[in-house]
């Protein structure tokens, strides 16, 4: 059996970290790539590099001759949709330019995308979204990245795949798109202040249909797509497999934190939570939590973004099922499991 070696780009994020953990269970050798690096253990080693620095990237990756699979999950945030294109396309380009010439046994490049491909970030879009849906007006960096891989694939011996999850939930700090942490910290602070748990988004977002993607399920789907012949050179929507409304999920979240539920009250978390660092530090001391800087515990801006969706956010996942991926996760159990793990790791009280 040929030994697989994965290069996981964006290794410190929720998606990359869970993917590495899954690859370890499969017996893969893993190289984690991130700006900050990480601690080597077992079959996992880390490389620290700024992917926007082309020369540094070429230098850092020039010796990765053993790589068979590239899993790309890196992301650079910017203030506007247009500004996202250049850095995110450049990082992917730099990685492929560095790895492809030296990794002579390269089999596959996996690209992590999302519902921005369907225009979910712009407003109400056609649901359930299908992988065959026509593109929307640019800019859209996910589309540019996929088109780049499609061009590079022409004449190459490797294949590609693109995974399109909904909002991804998992354990991870300092991540710009981690809704589970947003909810967990918001609920923990509500309890600390002795106030009920209110949904902070738009009233119509409270009753719209939405779905989530568990980070562990996404890791399994990513490896499946990268190693399955019938999944080559195409994109797949990946979700937990169930739908929910915040109006039904919110009371269950409140019950976990032993909180009462009050009617929704629209607010901008990025503004309302901006002055809560002293409260957080006091909670860390009082409850013996892991000393985590307030800036790393939650992305309030991302919470505002998701809680503003006053329209259904749903994708069709029948394509992946037809191709052979049948994993399913109950979203309520996912949320409660993540919150429990956050408690056990002493990240929240």
Regions found by a protein language model. Give the residues of each.
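Glycine/proline-rich active-site loop of Rossmann-fold NAD(P)-dependent oxidoreductases
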Residues: 156, 168-186, 216, 224-236, ...
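A conserved pocket-lining segment of Rossmann-fold NAD(P)-dependent short-chain dehydrogenase/reductase
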Residues: 185-213
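Mid/C-terminal beta-alpha module of Rossmann-like enzyme folds, strongest
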Residues: 219-303, 316-318, 322, 339, ...
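Active-site Tyr-X1-5-Lys
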Residues: 134-166, 171
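N-terminal Rossmann NAD(P)H-binding glycine-rich loop of SDR-like oxidoreductase domains
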Residues: 4-26
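Glycine-rich Rossmann NAD(P)(H)-binding loop
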Residues: 9, 170, 201-208, 236-243, ...
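Conserved Rossmann-fold NAD(P)-dependent oxidoreductase catalytic core, especially the SDR/UDP-sugar
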Residues: 70-72, 83-84, 90-141, 161
